[in-house]
Amino acid sequence: ALNRSSGQWIQTKNNNSKLLVDKRNIEILGVIGDVTQWTPINKTRLWVYHLHYFDYVSGDIQSNDSATIKSIIDHWIEKNKMGKRPGWEPYPLSLRVVNWIKFALNGQSISGDVLDSLSLQAWYLSRNLEYHLYANHLFRNAMAFCFAGLFWDTKYSEKWLRKGTSIITKEL
């Protein structure tokens, strides 16, 4: 179940958001590429990671087509099965979970498949935390847990929120 009693979400503008050029192309780090090619061989690893972050869905999307964004999210779910890299690496997964939740909280309806994927990604993250990297990676893992923990109202979400706040408290 979704947690709808946690207060009002204040929409934020992501000044670093990527530019969705059209229904298939996105500009990331000054380079345009096909948004449906999740592991392009002609792009840098950093570019590919940014593609999987989904930063462009969490900011001001008034100029973007939300139906296109939803289609891209659905395509990601279809093409990136659990554990498939680079999308399921903990750092890009953490950023994506937060961005998809922000997308939903910014007034966009999301499908049951997207909710299922978000839950699965949070569960997967709980088994693949980046303790070995610490710093920004572990912090982003913790933030994803906090967002997931507050977004849902389940026994798992309570654990995610506790885990996220515990990591943040310990690391700060």
Task: Locate predicted features.
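Extreme N-terminal leader/anchor segments
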Residues: A1-T36
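Short glycine/proline-rich turn/loop motifs
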Residues: T36-W38, E78-K79
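Aromatic-lined, polymer-binding surfaces characteristic
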Residues: T44-L172
